[in-house]
Design a protein with these regions (language model features):
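Active-site neighborhoods and metal-handling regions in enzymes and metal-associated proteins
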Residues: 1-117
Length: 117
């Protein structure tokens, strides 16, 4: 598998996450769903401390945490929230690394085109 293919696993997983994120969703569940999606798309492991998805919400998005010390919080996503997902899929020792911040406003994921208009 090529590097660009591993990156596509991460990119497709972020797009998937945008379709499932909703208020009341627990960050632990979101992490699990993202990791399962990457495996479904072809990842065979996760290169960064065996964590496939670092997931943060609200004020947690401003904190930098080492993978060695990372613990997904037992927090739920709010109606108006900010969620950062940082993915680290691996396939055949080739790493992917992709992160995005997703904004929810009035329970809906805000599309970047809406922000620009």
């Amino acid at each position: 598998m090529e590097y660009s293919e591993v990156q596509q696993i991460a990119k497709k997983t972020i797009e998937y996450a945008k379709t499932i994120i909703k208020p009341g969703m627990n960050l632990l569940d979101l992490r699990d769903l993202c990791e399962r999606k990457m495996l479904e798309l072809g990842a065979d492991s996760f290169w960064y401390w065996d964590i496939g998805a670092f997931v943060f919400a609200g004020d947690e998005t401003t904190v930098s945490v080492s993978g060695k010390k990372y613990v997904t919080s037992d927090r739920t996503i709010a109606e108006n929230d900010i969620v950062t997902i940082d993915l680290s899929p691996q396939c055949e020792n080739i790493w992917g690394d992709y992160a995005r911040t997703i904004i929810l406003e009035n329970s809906v994921v805000v599309d970047k085109r809406e922000i620009l208009n």
